[in-house]
Amino acid sequence: MNKIKNESLQVLASMLIINANYVHGTLYLKEDGVHFKANGLLADKEIRSQFLFNEIQHIKFGFSFKPYRIVIKTFSDEAYIFDFVSKQEGKALVQPVKQNLSRA
C-alpha cells in the first residue's frame, strides 16, 4: 500500500444524508483512509465519519449540478455523496485514494 504522508489533505464538502439535506464539513485524507468532520449541530453525531481504505470499493470525482462531487462506495454497497467540492481540492484528494485502492 502506498504510504500517505502524515500531513492531512483537507477538502471542504457537504455530505448528502437524506434527499436534499446536507451536512457541511471537511474531508480529510489520512494514513488509514478518508475521514469526514461535520460542522455545526451535527458535529460528532451519528453520521458516518470514517471511510477506511479496506472498506472503500470505489471512489470517484466529477461534475454535478452542485459544482463538483465526490462519491465513496463501500463494499457494503452504500454510496456516500459529498457535494460542493472544489475542483482542484477534490482531484487532489481522490487521486491518492485511487492509487491506494489499486495497490490493495
Locations of the language-model features?
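Phosphoinositide-binding peripheral membrane targeting modules
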Residues: 17-23, 31-71, 78
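Generic hydrophobic/packing signal
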Residues: 60, 74-76, 97, 101
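Short, compact, well-ordered microdomains
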Residues: 66-95
